[in-house]
Swiss-Prot record:
Reaction catalysed by this enzyme: N-acetyl-D-muramate 6-phosphate + H2O = N-acetyl-D-glucosamine 6-phosphate + (R)-lactate
Membership in a protein family: Belongs to the GCKR-like family. MurNAc-6-P etherase subfamily.
Pathway where it operates: Amino-sugar metabolism; N-acetylmuramate degradation
Recorded superkingdom: Bacteria
Keywords, comma-separated and alphabetical: Carbohydrate metabolism, Lyase
UniProt xrefs under PANTHER family: GLUCOKINASE REGULATORY PROTEIN (PTHR10088:SF4)
Protein's name in the database: N-acetylmuramic acid 6-phosphate etherase
Purpose of the protein: Specifically catalyzes the cleavage of the D-lactyl ether substituent of MurNAc 6-phosphate, producing GlcNAc 6-phosphate and D-lactate.
Organism of derivation: Porphyromonas gingivalis (strain ATCC 33277 / DSM 20709 / CIP 103683 / JCM 12257 / NCTC 11834 / 2561)
Gene3D superfamilies in the record: Glucose-6-phosphate isomerase like protein, domain 1
InterPro entries xrefs: Etherase_MurQ (IPR005488), Glucokinase_regulatory_CS (IPR005486), MURQ/GCKR (IPR040190), SIS_dom (IPR001347), SIS_dom_sf (IPR046348)
Keyword flag Lyase: yes
SIS domain: residues covered: 52-215
Pfam families given in the database record: GKRP_SIS_N
């Protein structure tokens, strides 16, 4: 019988009687277990990423799907891809049960609709070159399960991130990632360790894909969008370091070309000074 580790009683009790320091130390003690749990899933993450990269090289997209905290984390990771790596917002798409309103407020029973997730994928023109990753700590969210089931039936690559073993969601995924973090500090509050594990794994998936797709040079975000002064300053210093330019010359070069990568390529194409 399927057992929800995410619903098991906390290892701690009488929380209301603890001091602030005790609560913080307890939570930190539990959080230290998360990185260890994630490290055990690296082979699972690797297998999924190795399948995603060639699809995205051919123009495929990546969809994240979730409800509540899981959905918000998927939207968060997807929203960071354009500014960090200079990719269009349609390259990685985060979908949350209940739509954008659910990012700030709970939408009653949105996650219980088995058909809605697939309908939303269809509205984005999902096809067999794309990948759908379902995110659900429990592994039982109908919105996500229904979407993955239909995606898989239509020949679309599927993966999932969940915090229980042998969940219904994992059964619908080609490449399940089961990250077992144990009972939550507040019983059943999967926004805590499970959510932290999801965020770490999403970071690993998207960052490794972008590196494999050539969106990072050395260790630098050479394709980042220059959307604020901090990023313009960062890009300027990248060019200063690479080409021994003054700050003003590097900044002028960067703003002329609009990206570190293009500015760098323009410098390399210049004939050497005689």
């Amino acid at each position: 019988m399927f057992e929800k580790i995410t619903e098991q009683p906390s290892l701690y009790d009488r929380l209301e009687e603890k001091s602030t320091r005790e609560i913080l130390e307890d939570i930190n003690r539990e959080d230290r277990k998360v990185a260890e749990a994630v490290s055990r899933t690296i082979p699972m993450i690797e297998r999924l990423v190795e399948q995603i990269v060639p699809r995205m090289e051919q123009g495929g997209r990546l969809f994240y799907m979730g409800a509540g905290t899981s959905g918000r984390l998927g939207v968060l990771d997807a929203s960071e891809i354009p500014p960090t790596f200079g990719m269009p917002p349609t390259f990685v798409i985060g979908l949350i049960a209940g739509g954008d309103r659910a990012l700030r407020n709970p939408v009653e029973k949105a996650e219980d609709n088995t058909e809605r997730g697939w309908e939303e994928l269809l509205s984005h023109g999902v096809n067999s070159s794309d990948t759908v990753i379902g995110i659900a700590a429990s592994g039982t969210t109908p919105y996500v399960i229904g979407a993955l089931r239909e995606a898989r039936r239509h020949g679309i690559l599927t993966g999932c991130i969940c915090s229980n073993i042998g969940s219904p969601l994992a059964a619908e995924a080609d490449y399940p990632i089961e990250v077992i973090v144990g009972p939550e500090y507040v019983t059943g509050s999967s926004r805590m360790k499970s959510g932290t594990a999801q965020k770490m794994i999403l970071n690993m998936i998207s960052t490794s894909i972008m590196i494999r797709l050539g969106r990072v040079k050395g260790n630098r975000m050479v394709n980042m969008q220059l959307s604020n002064n901090k990023l313009i300053d960062r890009g300027t210093r990248m060019l200063m370091s690479e080409f021994d330019l003054s700050y003003e010359d590097a900044r002028t070069l960067l703003l002329r070309h609009g990206s570190v990568r293009i500015a760098s390529e323009s410098m390399k194409q210049k004939p050497p000074k005689k």
